[in-house]
Amino acid sequence: MRWYQAAITAALTLTFLSPGTASAQGRPCAGAKYSDSHFHLTNYIQEGTDVKDYVRMMGSTVCRSTLFGIPLQQAWDYRNTGDFAPWYYLQSDAPLYYYSFTDAFIAMAYKSLPAEQQARLDPMITGFNPTDMYAADHIRRVLTTFPGVFSGIGEFSIHKEFVSSKVAGGAASLTDPALDRILDFAGEAGMVVILHNDINVPFPKPGQDPYILAQLKAVLERHPNTTVIWAHVGLGRIVRPVTEQLVLLDRALSNPALSHVYIDISWDETAKYITASPEAVAATAALINKYPDRFLFGSDVVAPTSLDAPMAVYNDYQPLWNALTPEASQKVRLGNYQRLFDAARVKVRAWEKANVGKARPAPQPTPSSGAGVAP
């Protein structure tokens, strides 16, 4: 571990002495409303917002932001939609397929910015297939090809309403050892992971067991050294909260075996559940006030043309902001982002310093399979 400790020290020095880092960029964050832990620069046909325009939009309202595309491309199948070119997954029955070029696109967009603007962004790797045992190799390859760029992986999906059934190839699974390899490597490199995994299936029958919860708990407990942000509290357009969801979340957040797991409250579709009633707001606020270090805010806006859309999501949560303690509100909107992503920057830069240009080590066994994959 000597190399790792030395690299951490070097990375810390670079991080805190560079004029472009978060610690030295007080002006953009002075008076900011939030940092965005969940932002898509591009859409399902890989088009979107120019990164320079996005930084301009952020202005003094958004302190920092993640930066990632969509790992899936919506196919334009002429036999299905004719001359209509779908740009969203609900507009066509044609499949979605994994689109790895998104990572190079995000990296080059980030690298086109001056250092002081780069310091406000945390690019994420998404262009991998989580059913592929080589997915972890893709993530490693992106890191070594674009050192100094990425802070984490995600958002990527395992179970997602409407989307999972459209993806070409095998269905992603929480029990797949390919996912274990991904999470293993993210932990090794110090990357933050943003994972979309619905808490339940759409339209469950009365009394139906939410089997996804047990699988999710098991895979998260297998990777205690990997920082995971669970997106949207597991909710969706039609995936509703399960019975006693807040009780289950309380139990999870108090579990030492899950101390590495965080939750983002992002997306306007999530807001509709949290703000559905004064009682829902109060119960959610009580949970966040109890665990203020474990929640982050994100807009989950896709390729906006202005800050109106992200701010609309932020305002959707206003009843929640009003119900939180000032300390909890600050942490959810700003502080927890800085803490998690600053730590990731240091760890990932240290991993890159120790590994870029070096021979790739033999793959390690995954916790679930017990066998590695030959290099």
Regions found by a protein language model. Give the residues of each.
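Acidic-and-aromatic substrate-binding clefts and catalytic sites of carbohydrate-active enzymes
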Residues: L41-D50, L72-W76, L96-T102, F128-A136, ...
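Bacterial N-terminal signal peptides that target proteins for export
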Residues: M1-I8
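Mid-to-C-terminal alpha-helical segments outside catalytic/metal-binding sites
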Residues: S23-S35, Q46, D50-S65, N289-L296, ...
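Catalytic pocket-lining loop regions of alpha/beta-barrel enzymes
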Residues: K160, V167-F297
